[in-house]
């Protein structure tokens, strides 16, 4: 039978030329794998599985481990180089890297706070109104007000009637004498009122009676210098009784006068 134009005897010759000498390597690797499995099963478990301070096995441990495990020479050299590189890289770091960084942050690094802006604050609007005044200044103000007040009252006395004054105040007339009420002759009154003779001719009590139409001769304030208890009163009822008594007393006198002028 021809395969690709070649006869079977030629194919046999080509197979003879091929060399499968690597079979002993594969058999050796398989036998080495079985021995590695048995040796790994015979290893005792590690006493402390956790790594303390990043402890890594040394290069001697790697050599013994590589001798126990049958690995190709190229892979073993690569693993040995890698272990030496890791050891060198860890040797460059300090023993406690975390502690050093934390202390450096605490000692060297500082985070200053935001500086406060220095701006001028406006004074309180009601600071002046609530500030207490000294007692001497208040006393002086009251004293000065008491001095100027009577002058204002005297200057306003020439105006129209009905002006208010202090209680028990007395005024002088144009002739220089003391002002008196034309009805009860009172000199002191809180207010001078208009009467039948003009403005400021009656005291406050008589002026109120005159305004209401009840000013009669029997009426007198109790403070009037012409007040007589049997003839005057400051009560309206008492005044009406006095007027009735006067009328009763006048009737017989009028009858007698009438008989005297017209005899029978």
UniProtKB/Swiss-Prot annotation:
Mostly expressed in roots. Also expressed in flowers and leaves, and to a lower extent in stems. Residues 101-110 have a biased composition (Polar residues). A zinc finger (GATA-type) spans 175-229. Residues 29-57, 96-192 are annotated as: Disordered. Keywords: Activator, DNA-binding, Metal-binding, Nucleus, Transcription, Transcription regulation, Zinc, Zinc-finger. GO terms for molecular function: DNA-binding transcription factor activity; sequence-specific DNA binding; zinc ion binding. One of its GO terms (cellular component) is nucleus. Residues 29-42 have a biased composition (Low complexity). PROSITE patterns: GATA_ZN_FINGER_1, GATA_ZN_FINGER_2. Residues 155-164 have a biased composition (Gly residues). One of its GO terms (biological process) is positive regulation of DNA-templated transcription. It comes from the Eukaryota. It is found in: Nucleus. InterPro entries: GATA_TF (IPR051140), TF_GATA_pln (IPR016679), Znf_GATA (IPR000679), Znf_NHR/GATA (IPR013088). SUPFAM superfamilies: Glucocorticoid receptor-like (DNA-binding domain). A motif (Nuclear localization signal) lies at residues 114-121. Belongs to the type IV zinc-finger family. Class A subfamily. Transcriptional activator that specifically binds 5'-GATA-3' or 5'-GAT-3' motifs within gene promoters. May be involved in the regulation of some light-responsive genes. This is GATA transcription factor 2. It comes from Arabidopsis thaliana. The gene is GATA2.
């Amino acid at each position: 039978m021809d395969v690709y134009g070649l006869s079977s005897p030629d194919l046999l010759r080509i197979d003879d030329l091929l060399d499968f000498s690597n079979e002993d390597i594969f058999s050796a690797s398989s036998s080495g794998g079985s021995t590695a499995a048995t040796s790994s099963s015979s290893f005792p478990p590690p006493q402390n599985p956790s790594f303390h301070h990043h402890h890594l096995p040394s290069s001697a441990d790697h050599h013994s481990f590589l001798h126990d495990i049958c690995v190709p020479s190229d892979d073993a050299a690569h693993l040995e180089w890698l272990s030496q590189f890791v050891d060198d890289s860890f040797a460059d770091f300090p023993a406690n890297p975390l502690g050093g960084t934390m202390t450096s942050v605490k000692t060297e690094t500082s985070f200053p706070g935001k500086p406060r802006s220095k701006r001028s604050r406006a004074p309180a609007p009601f600071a002046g109104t609530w500030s207490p005044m000294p007692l001497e200044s208040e006393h002086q103000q009251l004293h000065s007000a008491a001095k100027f007040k009577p002058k204002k009252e005297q200057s306003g006395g020439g105006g129209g009637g009905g002006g208010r004054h202090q209680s028990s105040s007395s005024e002088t007339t144009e002739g220089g004498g003391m002002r008196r009420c034309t009805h009860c002759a009172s000199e002191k009154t809180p207010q001078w009122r208009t009467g039948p003779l003009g403005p400021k001719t009656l005291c406050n009590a008589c002026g109120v009676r005159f305004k209401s139409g009840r000013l009669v001769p029997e009426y007198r304030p109790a403070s009037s210098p012409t007040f007589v208890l049997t003839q005057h009163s400051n009560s309206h009822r008492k005044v009406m009784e006095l007027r009735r008594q006067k009328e009763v007393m006048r009737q017989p006198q009028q009858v007698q006068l009438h008989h005297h002028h017209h005899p029978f």
